[in-house]
Amino acid sequence: MDKIIVKGGNTRLSGEVVIEGAKNAVLPLLAATILASEGQTTLTNVPILSDVYTMNNVVRGLDIAVDFNEENNTVVVDASGEILDQAPYEYVSKMRASIVVLGPILARNGHAKVSMPGGCTIGSRPIDLHLKGLEAMGAKIIQVGGDITATAEKLKGATIYMDFPSVGATQNLMMAATLADGVTTIENAAREPEIVDLAILLNEMGANVKGAGTEKLVIKGVKSLHGTQHAVIQDRIEAGTFMVAAAMTSGNVLIKDAIWEHNRPLISKLLEMGVDVKEEDRGIRVKSDVSKLKPVAVKTLPHPGFPTDMQAQFTALMAVVKGKSSISETVFENRFQHLEEMRRMGLHSEILRDTAMIHGGLPLQGARVMSTDLRASAALILTGMVAEGTTTVGKLTHLDRGYYKFHEKLAKLGAQISRVSEA
């Protein structure tokens, strides 16, 4: 079992960092390749992450050829032959995002069986919106013993209103609707950049998807989809994590190829704090003087609101800003587990329902801590950079799901950080 060791107290990050392709984009893109009954689909700018290997194995388990070339960050998928209709439990159980294969398998085969997914233990994160949407399109859904079986000889276009703009449900229903008879309208759809990226791929494959990035999606079904080539967008959450890292260490960092528009909700809060954030030709530059930063109030919301996947990292920034800040989590319940670990490092905080109050600017000390989920693992490492002494972060399986060589990138920026194997 690996662990990360951080020596903190005087860290000041500077330099340039390269951002990978987006984890939250590539997983549904890989699911979408299932829909291509003609030709090969090539995805470029694919990040080397454990979740990508897991999704590759989910798709491969459907008797689909998947070739991942790590040297050039490319995945080639050939789903042109007959495919199986049951996703392999061994891999689906590891990752929540694997539920997005349900819609593509059903649309392609008329029958699909997928186990309830695994992943980070953040609240209940129900999948009822996925299932209700498919039922509205004519699917019969049966849930028995942790397995979901969906049947529909041919999905029918429908008008679907989602009670909450779920990203995963929007993606699942988008993909299913591409091969349905007639027109499907999804109202109160998710608007994240990853939704737009998926719509672009689907249209490149021959689909007819309109409205991506707005609250209303209109998908006109077609008879079949074909392979294509598509570049995965940059990871806005990784970019945001390095923006926060620069801000909390009084750093000066260029986040190369980061997309300003994708990160606008986070950038607006950094600017409100007093962080200097500027768009440059090669990316986004973040400069900061922690002693001059002001506390802020943040509320996570579906895009274009502040991203829930940046909540833990922003908490780490709040910890070094003098005064009382607050952060409200409205997307997922039970997503403050990292605060208990940060308290071991001297963080003063309290939680009232869905809001955490952070008393920042007080001394932090290194400690042994454990990652509780993917983004919390990054937050603990960032906190370790500004805490006096040595911090050891364990349970790195979470980190590897969403960050590629995170410790190496931080080290190149000036952090005293290493990753070691623990017997």
Curated annotation (Swiss-Prot):
Subcellular location: Cytoplasm
Signal peptide extent: none
Catalytic residue list: C120 (proton donor)
Main localization, broad class: cytoplasm
InterPro entries the UniProt entry points to: Enolpyruvate_Tfrase_dom, Enolpyruvate_Tfrase_sf, MurA_subfamily, RNA3'P_cycl/enolpyr_Trfase_a/b, UDP_GlcNAc_COvinyl_MurA
Pathway(s) of this molecule: Cell wall biogenesis; peptidoglycan biosynthesis
TM annotation in the entry: none
Modified residues (2-(S-cysteinyl)pyruvic acid O-phosphothioketal): C120
Broad class of enzyme this protein falls into: transferase
GO cellular component, one term: cytoplasm
GO-annotated biological processes: cell division; cell wall organization; peptidoglycan biosynthetic process; regulation of cell shape; UDP-N-acetylgalactosamine biosynthetic process
Catalytic reaction list: phosphoenolpyruvate + UDP-N-acetyl-alpha-D-glucosamine = UDP-N-acetyl-3-O-(1-carboxyvinyl)-alpha-D-glucosamine + phosphate
Record's keyword terms, sorted: Cell cycle, Cell division, Cell shape, Cell wall biogenesis/degradation, Cytoplasm, Peptidoglycan synthesis, Pyruvate, Transferase
UniProt GO molecular function: UDP-N-acetylglucosamine 1-carboxyvinyltransferase activity
Residues the record lists as binding phosphoenolpyruvate: K23, N24
Residues involved in UDP-N-acetyl-alpha-D-glucosamine binding: R96, R125, P126, I127, D128, L129, D309, V331
UniProt-listed Pfam families: EPSP_synthase
EC number: 2.5.1.7
Annotated family: Belongs to the EPSP synthase family. MurA subfamily.
Biological role stated in the UniProt entry: Cell wall formation. Adds enolpyruvyl to UDP-N-acetylglucosamine.
Record HAMAP family: MurA
Protein name: UDP-N-acetylglucosamine 1-carboxyvinyltransferase 1
Organism: Streptococcus thermophilus (strain ATCC BAA-250 / LMG 18311)
